[in-house]
Structure formats: C-alpha cells, structure tokens
C-alpha cells in the first residue's frame, strides 16, 4: 500500500561509497518496526542483495528483497520465495547456444553464483566480485545447465555492445524482454518483466 517503502539498491539506497548510511538504516528499521513493509529492489540476483537486507535487520523484523528486475521476490525472515519468474530451460539453452559465438560476455546469475561458458576479459569477474558471489565457468554450459534462467546479463565495451545486442534482440525479442541497462550491460529477462 501507500505506507510501504520501496528502495532500489543502485543509486537510491546506497551512498557514493556503496554503503547504507546510518541515517537511512535507522529510518528504514524504524519504518519496519512501525509496521511498514520495506522492499529492496534490484536488477541483480536476490542472493547478491541479501547482505543489505541483513544490515536492515530483515531477518529479525521482516522485509522483502526483489531481484532480477522483479523476477524473484524473497521474504528474508521466512526464507520463502514468494515469486519466481524464469525462462523455460529450452529457451535458456537456446540463448546460451546462440550467444556463444557473439562478441559479448554472457552471464547467468543463479543462487549465489554467476554461470558463464567462458572466462570473459573483464565484466564476468567484475560482476562476481561486486556481488560477492562465485563465478562458475562451464565451457559446455548449454548441455550442463539444469535450471531455467531468471535473467541473462551480457557485457561488452560500449563501443562493441550494440552489434551482438541487436543480434540477440532480433533472435529472441518475441519471447523475452530485453534492455540495454548501462553502456556496457544488455539484459534478457522473461516476457512481462522489465
């Protein structure tokens, strides 16, 4: 409802040092104790933002994290996944296969890890480091993957990203949502999310 508090992780919840300020932390904890629902929302995977929920004492007082651009919502106090939108496993495999020869780094965030089919030049390791998750490099990922993806994250330099992104768009735009989220990131999500 109108009394609920929603905070995006990137740019609004965190200060320039990528931390929650004491003032913000105290205001949000007070709001939770007063009965307001507080949600931390991010395009990142749920596991990559749970450390923020811990700092806001969601595990004690309650609160939700919304990852993957709303594709997965988790109640931190109970551990329950309330909502989970994925692309089916066949589509997940098709995107992996199609993207393998493109000049772009491919990442699939899942349960505290980032899966990729080859070590990237820069972005895959950087993304894993930022989130504090492990990087799983599996050259035969298309055949080995056993879960449907919540999201694909593709990365490349700003000068080179548009060509492979356009090929992905042309191939999969009818069955997925796609967005260039930064100058160097291109995302593919289940239809209906953005």
Task: Mark where each language-model region is.
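Short, small-residue-biased leader/transition segments that mark boundaries at the very start
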Residues: 1-6
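N-terminal G-site helix/loop of the GST-like fold
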Residues: 7, 15
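Conserved residues at the C-terminal ends of beta-strands
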Residues: 8, 68, 155
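A short local structural element in Rossmann-fold oxidoreductases
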Residues: 14, 50, 165
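Conserved ATPase-coupling elements of RecA-like P-loop NTPase cores
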Residues: 16-20
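Active-site phosphate-binding/coordination module
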Residues: 22-123
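Conserved acidic, metal-coordinating active-site core of Asp-based
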Residues: 98, 104-194
């Amino acid at each position: 409802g109108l009394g609920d508090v929603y905070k995006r992780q990137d740019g609004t919840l965190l200060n320039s040092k990528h931390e929650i300020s004491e003032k913000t932390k105290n205001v949000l904890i007070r709001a939770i104790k007063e009965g307001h629902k507080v949600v931390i929302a991010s395009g990142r995977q749920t596991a990559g933002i749970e450390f923020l929920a811990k700092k806001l004492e969601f595990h004690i007082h309650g609160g939700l994290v919304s990852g993957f651009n709303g594709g997965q919502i988790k109640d931190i106090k109970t551990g329950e996944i309330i909502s989970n939108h994925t692309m089916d496993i066949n589509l997940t495999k098709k995107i992996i296969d199609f993207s393998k020869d493109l000049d772009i780094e491919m990442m699939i965030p899942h349960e505290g890890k980032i899966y990729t089919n080859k070590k990237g030049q820069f972005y895959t390791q950087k993304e894993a480091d930022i989130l504090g998750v492990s990087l799983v490099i599996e050259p035969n990922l298309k055949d080995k993957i056993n879960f449907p993806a919540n999201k694909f994250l593709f990365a490349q330099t700003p000068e080179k990203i548009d060509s492979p992104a356009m090929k992905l768009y042309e191939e999969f735009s009818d069955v997925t949502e796609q967005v260039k989220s930064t100058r160097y990131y291109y995302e593919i999500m289940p239809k209906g999310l953005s």
